[in-house]
Amino acid sequence: MKKETWRLVAHGRVQGVGYRAACADAADDLELGGWVRNRLDGTVEVMAHGTVRQLEALQAWMEQGPPAAQVTLVEVGPGEGEFAGFEFRPTI
């Protein structure tokens, strides 16, 4: 199957609630490659590489997030790169 890379940005109460770690676990469960990081503007940014079906599943998870999160929006757009494994990146 053809793979794509998407950039997803979660808005709302998504920092300090375990969102990044839970998102990385969800991405691992979906066998996606890529990374996740906090941004100084209070969002969480994800670059994910996989099939459209896998990416749509991650987007659906991100729209809900872990129980303590309150997600108001998940922006989705094209991303760059191909990744093996999923990692944490430093905050920017």
Swiss-Prot record:
Disulfide bonds: none annotated. Keywords: Hydrolase. Its EC number is 3.6.1.7. The active site is at residues 20, 38. The keyword Hydrolase applies. InterPro entries: Acylphosphatase, Acylphosphatase-like_dom, Acylphosphatase-like_dom_sf, Acylphosphatase_CS. It catalyses: an acyl phosphate + H2O = a carboxylate + phosphate + H(+). One of its GO terms (molecular function) is acylphosphatase activity. It comes from the Bacteria. Residues 5-90 form the Acylphosphatase-like domain. Belongs to the acylphosphatase family. PANTHER family: ACYLPHOSPHATASE. This is Acylphosphatase. It comes from Cupriavidus necator (strain ATCC 17699 / DSM 428 / KCTC 22496 / NCIMB 10442 / H16 / Stanier 337) (Ralstonia eutropha). The gene is acyP.
